[in-house]
Amino acid sequence: MKLNPNNPNFIGFDWFAGDEYAYDSKGENKERYKELCVKHNDTNYDRREIKPEDALGINGDARYRRVFGHDFVEIDVISDRDFDDAHPAGTSLGDVVKYGGKSYWEYVKRGYTGNPVSELDGYINNIPEDGLCLLKSFWLNFPEVSVEASGTHNLQILFVVDDGTELVFNLTMYLEPSN
């Protein structure tokens, strides 16, 4: 996880880096990549969009078409402090915290037509029915923080993977009031 000094109410997730899979993965990661392709019915792609020697020019590194190794079906964030009257300490902030990111999932579902990357944006209590899949990037954001809710919060962030696995992270974060 990383915090953004330019947006203090933003949490970026790069902790997935150890669970990242691509067509050029090796060994066990290559096998997991193949499993993910079958799981997402992503087995018919038949064209190269960029030459391997040009891959570094896309995003400045060779991580162009890599995805995180988890599909999320539920996310929750809980604070040890009151957020507002409707969100006392210890209750879900699901209708307050937004998720965002980029995904290849819609591209695969469309049969590889249109833009390969879809933008994700929504509240964490309203994740799409088929989950958050084939993520290229992912973040959480507190878009509206009142003066009363600003300050240091000890957050518990829960991710539920589609196989039922729960990933729990604890983070101390200073939330600044929205403008």
Language model region names:
Residues 1-179:
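Non-catalytic macromolecular-recognition regions in eukaryotic signaling proteins
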